[in-house]
């Protein structure tokens, strides 16, 4: 019986279908807890008396040694039967194997033992006055008094024990047999052709367990070292031959490891890791060349464990995932369009793991771990491992803790601006070296395309390679869950945990899920393979899993090579640059704002630049994963809650306003309106029309995660904003209808929230503000009620302290000051709105240091002073609203100072809307239109009309060391520049999400 609560990702219909499918194939009958699980042997000797922290290297170590004694003897016999271990090295070989065997069993025994000792102790069955004494008593008496009860409590553990024992003895015997079968080849790898016997000095197993517990192994002979791989080494052999033949044809030289090939296994020469400077230009250039070759061969999984740094360059040692199959087909399921953004991303260099590759959890502020070969600055690892707290006691605790809390690198405080600039300079230099090598090899492939394709055909046609269908990390998590006391005590839990693979993706084939479950029940990481010239995905024993490749990996790779060109190269370079430099933004357009607030240039040049940006956006759009999905882009993805440690990972852009597809579509709609290019309108419609169809049909939702659904910039309010803008610029009333329908849905939901969350970007208050400011809901009373409850919370002090410490507009108080002032007279209680604004203004005064308002931004530094999101421009917007709608509370001197500060500091940083010059100018344009006599009004008009010439913008957009040039984001990227330029060229009304007010100034 499956447990519903363990599969929360599935809806009720999906869960019932899974239950039915499992029943139809009698899957649970295969999980027998008794028939194939003989009782664990009970040694006759007592448990040794040496127990406790001074006698044992780990908790229960002595108990394990006693329990597994008979199995240890079998390992000794297997080693003794080998022809390759002499008397001198016998203890070392046996010791290494026994350690590995113990670890495999302990992975499943340790947590149940900790739980059981606690249970036995709570029942008063242990003797001793201290927790340490009771632990010793438990271990000594375990065979006689507690062993039977232990296995009764955890019946699945007998099965697990039997599997591990059977697997381990089989793979040890198999290893020695394979050494003997390939001895001549191993001698060739070692250069040991004399008659001296091969003598094995040490043996170290390492890696994940696949296909019956098999794992890689490092074999140190007296003649040298080789690596054993218990799977096909076709990929390694083909890569070696390709590298040799490319060098003969004049390609950049690379080093590859030699292999000896057996049937579904092989041995590889050992590549010694060298101490290499990862900032050295020569090393980076050679790594870039290797990366371009991997890109051509669709090579993946090239992370730090799979390449070895040497003075000659990086040497790959794990090549089972070249010719990676991206275009997979589920039996009976709809095909993904060839032009889909998903497939385009999967083939990109960003997925190779050779670049800095930072993995984060759902909350990026918790840190990251960089697994890339060319790693960047390392952070606090947010992922968790298992530790035993209070070991050698009866009250020991098994706890999951972050790896960073186990002594790994700590995030600490964010570095100062000077340190960030130094790191930025280092990363820019590293990126340039890497890019230089990547461009060289990429262009060499393009210039010798026919020869490259012929080489791939001749060397790769019959390869057997690995098909990576799911990240190994996800499978590893399930294996750990199978070792929990809960899983080992219940067949239902054990079965359901393995069946969580059904929730990994939508529409997974039943055959695939069953194959994964069978592997997991054997305690293996599921492993799948494919032949390069065929379309089937198979298990290690050749069973097809209801999943195929559309054309074969070979044809997919050849087709990929045929489409390599300068436009594609530019996209890959964006991905490379972002991987290196995105955590280190360039925030200086000019030292003095006066240098860029003049010399606008001609309108023709502006239109040419706008056309160039829009052409690029229209050319790089891709279809969704289904014909009815909105079209989108693949690019580095900026975060609306950016932290220094957060890299802009390349991905398929979602339908969000901040950095996603709908913001880009809005900019293209504006460009179509001003420039008159039909192609831009068609591209915008490709994004907007499917969304409008979904909204107006009422049959489906937009499938946004619930936690972001009502966020102004990441959720449905932002989509409604862009649809309304699209309606305005494209003349399409259907888009307006969809915007209002979606806005009404948002309004109805947030109206039910008793204590709305503050913050413009992501709070309920921000959603209400955007809906009101741009008339996105017909029921205005709903968002007004949200503002009223927000006012009540402010007056009562019911809002989190962190919010009170932020003065800015994006996440702080300024947006609330703006909204409560702007709509104070429309709210249920104008006086309450006034009182709340007065409270916020008093708090804002406390953050005023006389020069600017302390921002207290999440990243802990004042990088955005003067701009909209966290700086003076946002404060100016708020104070201008107070001046217009609650004049009795206005502080004109503060407003004037905020405008001056914004003009001085906020117009010289970068070209973004969120925290750069263009957003600052939009804000100041709104302010001076509503407060015409504000300080520096003429300078603002002059900057908007005459500043930011085309050559400056073009130079910045062409500079790939500036992260904002790498993304088409509306808020922090190239489509934001397009929007600003076309609005200025067309002299159209201000329509921007950073100013939540579309009404004309009074």
Residue ranges and their predicted role:
Residues 643-661, 700-716, 751-764, 799-814, ...:
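Solvent-exposed loop and edge beta-strand segments that line ligand/cofactor-binding
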Residues 355, 594-600, 662-677, 718-732, ...:
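Well-ordered alpha-helical scaffold segments within catalytic/enzyme domains
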Residues 912-915, 927-1002:
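CBM-like carbohydrate-recognition segments
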Residues 1-135, 139-176, 313-611:
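C-terminal catalytic region of ATP-dependent kinase domains
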Residues 75-82, 86, 90-299, 304, ...:
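Conserved ATP-binding subdomain of kinase catalytic cores across diverse folds
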């Amino acid at each position: 019986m499956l447990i519903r609560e363990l599969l929360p990702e599935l809806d009720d219909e999906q869960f019932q279908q899974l239950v039915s499918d499992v029943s139809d194939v009698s899957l649970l009958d295969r999980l027998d807890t008794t028939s194939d699980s003989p009782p664990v042997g009970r040694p006759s000797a007592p448990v040794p008396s040496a127990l406790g922290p001074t006698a044992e290297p780990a908790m229960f170590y002595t108990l394990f040694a006693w329990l597994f004694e008979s199995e240890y003897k079998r390992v000794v016999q297997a080693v003794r039967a080998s022809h390759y271990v002499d008397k001198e090295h016998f203890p070392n070989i046996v010791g290494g194997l026994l350690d590995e065997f113990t670890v495999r069993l302990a992975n499943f025994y340790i947590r149940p033992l900790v739980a059981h000792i606690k249970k036995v102790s709570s029942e008063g069955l242990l003797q001793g006055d201290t927790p340490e004494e009771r632990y010793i008593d438990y271990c000594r008496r375990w065979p006689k008094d507690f062993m039977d009860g232990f296995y009764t409590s955890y019946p699945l553990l007998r099965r697990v024990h039997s599997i591990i024992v059977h697997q381990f003895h089989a793979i040890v015997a198999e290893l020695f047999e394979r050494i003997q079968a390939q001895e001549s080849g191993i001698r060739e790898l070692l250069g040991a052709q004399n008659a001296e016997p091969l003598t094995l000095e040490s043996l170290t197993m390492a890696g994940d367990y696949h296909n019956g517990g098999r794992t890689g192994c490092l074999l140190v002979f007296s003649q040298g070292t080789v690596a054993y791989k218990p799977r096909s080494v076709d990929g390694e052999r083909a890569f070696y031959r390709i590298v040799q033949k490319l060098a003969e044809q004049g390609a950049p030289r690379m080093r590859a490891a030699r292999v000896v090939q057996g049937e579904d296994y092989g041995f590889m020469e050992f590549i010694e890791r060298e101490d290499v400077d990862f900032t050295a230009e020569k090393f980076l250039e050679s790594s870039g060349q290797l990366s371009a070759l991997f890109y051509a061969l669709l090579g993946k999984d090239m992370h730090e464990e799979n390449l070895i740094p040497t003075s000659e360059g990086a040497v790959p040692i794990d090549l089972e995932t070249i010719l990676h199959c991206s275009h997979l087909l589920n039996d009976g399921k709809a095909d993904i369009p060839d032009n889909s953004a998903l497939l385009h991303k999967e083939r990109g260099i960003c997925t190779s793991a050779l670049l800095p590759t930072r993995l984060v959890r759902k909350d990026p502020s918790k840190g990251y771990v960089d697994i890339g070969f060319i790693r960047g600055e390392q952070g606090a690892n947010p992922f968790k491992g298992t530790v035993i707290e209070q070991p050698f006691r009866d009250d020991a605790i098994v706890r999951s803790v972050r790896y960073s809390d186990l002594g790994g690198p700590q995030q600490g405080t964010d570095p100062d601006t000077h340190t960030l600039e130094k790191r930025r300079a280092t990363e820019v230099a590293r990126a340039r070296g890497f890019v230089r090598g990547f461009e060289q090899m990429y262009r060499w492939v393009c210039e010798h395309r026919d020869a490259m394709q012929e080489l791939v055909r001749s060397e790769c046609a019959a390869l057997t390679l690995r098909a990576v269908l799911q990240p190994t990390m996800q499978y590893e998590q399930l294996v750990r869950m199978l070792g929990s006391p809960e899983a080992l005590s219940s067949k239902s839990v054990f079965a359901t945990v393995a069946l969580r693979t059904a929730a990994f993706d939508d529409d997974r084939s039943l055959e695939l899920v069953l194959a994964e479950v069978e592997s997991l029940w054997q305690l293996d990481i599921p492993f799948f393979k494919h032949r390069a010239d065929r379309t089937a995905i198979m298990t290690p024993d050749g069973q097809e899993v209801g999943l195929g490749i559309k054309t074969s990996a070979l044809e997919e790779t050849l087709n990929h090579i045929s489409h390599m060109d300068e436009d594609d190269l530019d996209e890959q370079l964006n991905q490379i640059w972002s991987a290196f430099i995105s955590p280190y933004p360039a925030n200086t357009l000019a030292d003095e704002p006066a240098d860029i607030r003049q010399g606008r240039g001609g309108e023709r040049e502006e239109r040419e630049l706008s056309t160039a940006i829009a052409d690029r956006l229209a050319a790089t759009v891709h279809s969704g994963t289904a014909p009815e999905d909105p079209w989108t882009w693949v690019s580095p993805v900026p975060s609306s809650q950016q932290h220094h440690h957060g890299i802009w990972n390349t991905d398929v852009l979602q339908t969000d306003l901040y950095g996603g597809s709908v913001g880009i579509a809005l900019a293209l709609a504006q460009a179509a309106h001003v420039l008159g290019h039909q192609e831009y309108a068609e591209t915008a419609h490709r994004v907007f029309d499917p969304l409008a169809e979904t909204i107006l049909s009422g049959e489906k939702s937009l499938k946004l995660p619930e936690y972001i659904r009502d966020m102004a910039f990441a959720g449905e309010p932002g989509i409604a904003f862009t649809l309304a803008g699209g309606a305005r610029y494209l003349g399409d009333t259907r888009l307006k209808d969809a915007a209002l329908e979606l806005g009404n849905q948002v309004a109805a939901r947030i109206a039910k929230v008793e204590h709305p969350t503050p913050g413009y970007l992501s709070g309920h208050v921000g959603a209400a503000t955007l809906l009101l400011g741009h008339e996105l809901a017909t029921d205005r009373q709903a968002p007004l009620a949200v503002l009223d409850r927000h006012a009540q919370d402010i007056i009562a002090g019911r809002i989190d302290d962190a919010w009170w410490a932020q003065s800015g507009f994006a996440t702080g108080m300024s947006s609330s000051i703006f909204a409560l002032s702007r709509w104070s007279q429309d709210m249920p209680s104008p006086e309450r709105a006034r009182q709340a604004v007065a409270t916020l203004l008093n708090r804002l005064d406390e953050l005023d240091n006389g020069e600017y308002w302390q921002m207290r931004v999440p990243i802990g530094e004042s990088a955005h002073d003067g701009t909209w999101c966290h700086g003076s421009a946002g404060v100016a917007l708020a104070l201008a609203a107070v001046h217009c709608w609650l004049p009795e509370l206005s502080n004109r001197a503060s407003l004037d100072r905020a405008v001056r500060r914004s003009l001085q500091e906020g117009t010289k940083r970068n070209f973004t809307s969120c925290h750069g010059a263009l957003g600052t100018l939009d804000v100041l344009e709104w302010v001076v239109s509503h407060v015409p006599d504000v300080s520096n009004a003429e300078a603002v008009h002059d900057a908007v009309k005459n500043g930011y010439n085309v050559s400056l913008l073009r130079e910045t957009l062409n500079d790939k060391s500036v992260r904002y040039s790498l993304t088409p984001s509306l808020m922090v990227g190239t489509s934001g520049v397009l929007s600003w330029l076309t609005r200025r060229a067309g002299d159209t009304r201000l329509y921007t999400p950073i100013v939540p007010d579309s009404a004309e100034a009074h």
